[in-house]
């Protein structure tokens, strides 16, 4: 897995649309594999469909040219995310979501030169206990918080970041629009930024 998120937006990503989605274009939606890597996720029977719906909404809303791409989402536990966080970021503690964009020096060229083969966008890992605790602490439905984190992780894979205030505002605004299209309230209304 790559170590860092790319800064800014890729040239292969289109401008954001308004939040009134039409039918989702399957040409924009990346093939997404959801892997349940920890038994604790069995308590959330709809987790896989929640993640898939969030990623489809994100890809459609930002009009991403990701239809020939693949990504994997690992639903794991705090121990799994802590190990990844320690290995790839040098931070020995769990977090809610990690994104590992695939190395793509020039994503636009990769989109054009794939010869029909899917391009790997990267991987997302989501920690059950942290997501559950945050949702409970913030009084949010678990599915809403999981949707937010799936969207957040996906946006990192396609080039969004929050290293600067300007980047954070762009990313958060995009997240709000995507989630509003899913009927999910502003996740930042009464809290600090996702980090």
UniProtKB/Swiss-Prot annotation:
Transmembrane segment boundaries: none
Cofactors named for this entry: Zn(2+)
Subcellular location, record wording: Cytoplasm
Entry's Gene Ontology BP terms: rRNA processing
Highest classification ranks of the organism: Bacteria, Pseudomonadati, Pseudomonadota, Alphaproteobacteria, Hyphomicrobiales
InterPro entries for the chain: MetalPrtase_cat_dom_sf_prd, YbeY, YbeY_CS
Co-factor binding details: Binds 1 zinc ion.
Top EC class, one word: hydrolase
Protein name from the UniProt record: Endoribonuclease YbeY
Role this protein plays: Single strand-specific metallo-endoribonuclease involved in late-stage 70S ribosome quality control and in maturation of the 3' terminus of the 16S rRNA.
A cellular component annotation (GO) from this entry: cytoplasm
Entry GO MF terms: metalloendopeptidase activity; RNA endonuclease activity; zinc ion binding
Source superkingdom: Bacteria
HAMAP family tied to this protein: Endoribonucl_YbeY
Family: Belongs to the endoribonuclease YbeY family.
A Pfam entry, by short name: YbeY
EC number in record: 3.1.-.-
Chain residues that bind Zn(2+): 152, 156, 162
Keywords per UniProt: Cytoplasm, Endonuclease, Hydrolase, Metal-binding, Nuclease, Ribosome biogenesis, rRNA processing, Zinc
């Amino acid at each position: 897995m790559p170590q860092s998120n790319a800064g800014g937006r890729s040239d292969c990503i289109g401008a954001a649309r308004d939040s009134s989605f039409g039918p989702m274009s399957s040409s924009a939606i990346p093939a997404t594999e959801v892997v349940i890597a920890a038994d604790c996720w069995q308590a959330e029977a709809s987790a896989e469909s929640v993640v898939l719906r969030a990623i489809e909404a994100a890809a459609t809303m930002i009009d991403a040219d990701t239809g020939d791409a693949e990504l994997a989402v690992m639903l794991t536990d705090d121990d799994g995310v802590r190990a990844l966080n320690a290995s790839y970021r040098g931070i020995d503690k769990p977090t809610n979501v990690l994104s590992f964009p695939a190395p793509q020096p020039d994503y636009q060229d990769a989109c054009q030169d794939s010869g029909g083969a899917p391009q790997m966008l990267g991987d997302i890992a989501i920690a059950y206990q942290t997501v559950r605790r945050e949702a409970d602490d913030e009084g949010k439905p678990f599915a809403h918080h999981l949707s937010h984190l799936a969207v957040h992780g996906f946006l990192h894979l396609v080039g969004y970041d929050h290293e600067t205030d300007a980047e954070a505002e762009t990313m958060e605004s995009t997240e709000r629009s995507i989630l509003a299209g899913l009927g999910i309230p502003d996740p930042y209304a009464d809290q600090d930024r996702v980090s």
